[in-house]
Amino acid sequence: MAKTYDYLFKLLLIGDSGVGKTCALFRFSEDAFNATFISTIGIDFKIRTIELDGKRIKLQIWDTAGQERFRTITTAYYRGAMGIMLVYDITNEKSFENIRNWVRNIEEHASPDVEKMILGNKCDANDKRQVSREQGEKLAASFGIKFMETSAKANINIENAFFTLARDIKAKMDKKLEGNSPQGSNQGVKITPDQQKKSSFFRCVLL
């Protein structure tokens, strides 16, 4: 049977329990929101095929449990990931502070050239905000990665986040396939204008 896609990208969602990783994944894969999800046990995944630059890209997106007791299970999935989204809840300062710990987990267990992005989720709950957008931007900039505020509930920036991460992975793959750039070099070449800076920031806007 012929393949129905040109690329297969494995993505990973990590972050503390309750930050909305499952809701973000469900919004992207099913375009739906369910406020009654229970905490993920171990690991689960969804698949969605998208089109970028005329290529069909199959996204296999793994949703990991945030609890410490599942850490051994979930870190085993880091190595094969091509892109990782680190998610915190803007209404939970502790989940934001723990992003640094999640970054350390990536450095220990994931591929050195994995694409990363930080998501400040639940930005629709602005009245309960504990983490400012500027704090999120500053943290992402300190790691040299992209940042977006998102809301699975209000469907803000979810699509944009996954497409941006997939586009960055594809740009990196295309460069490697060309064979004219050493690994680890600047990834800015051939990236479209809306991706030129790895520390780009995206605002949460409620319409």
Curated annotation (Swiss-Prot):
Annotated Mg(2+) binding sites: T22, T40, D63
UniProt subcellular location: Cell membrane; Golgi apparatus; Endosome membrane; Recycling endosome membrane
Key words of the record: Cell membrane, Cell projection, Cytoplasm, Cytoplasmic vesicle, Cytoskeleton, Endosome, Golgi apparatus, GTP-binding, Hydrolase, Lipoprotein, Magnesium, Membrane, Metal-binding, Methylation, Nucleotide-binding, Prenylation, Protein transport, Proto-oncogene, Transport
rRNA-binding among keywords: no
Enzymatic class: hydrolase
Named cofactor requirement(s): Mg(2+)
Signal sequence extent: none
Lipid attachment residues per UniProt (S-geranylgeranyl cysteine): C204
Gene Ontology MF term list: GDP binding; GTP binding; GTPase activity; small GTPase binding
Name of the featured protein: Ras-related protein Rab-8A
